[in-house]
């Protein structure tokens, strides 16, 4: 008999391999050195924290990044691309492990501090094994949708 009923995964650094140097290099290639200096996967800068908290939209965050770096010509799409460079891959072996848990009757969920732009890239990564993200999880809890950030107690309720 299974005593484990549910496994909750994080995305960045757990399921999704990250490359901070690739991300900061992408921002620097856009002339956004000031933004590159703020990138940290585990301790987001205040502005990125507000984006992940769902307090500001992606467009509003882009406006702040352009102001901060003095690059009004950089588009939202370019910023999304640069931010997406953080996200490398989801190894297929991890997807198969999630499948194995589900085959044993274990519920699988995601709880992640994230933002809408990154989620577009992440959702595509789940298709590497021919499925969608929703095929792997019973529930997906994202900070920007819940308007709460880990590790706050409220996000776990």
Stretch-by-stretch model annotation:
Residues 95-98, 156:
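Generic structural signal for well-ordered alpha-helices
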Residues 112:
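Short beta-strand/turn micro-motifs composed of small residues
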Residues 2-96, 103-104, 115-116, 142:
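N-terminal helical cap/lid subdomain that shapes the substrate entry/recognition surface
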Residues 104-105, 136:
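Structured helix-beta-strand junction loops
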Residues 116-157:
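Substrate-recognition "cap/lid" segment bordering the active-site pocket of phosphatases
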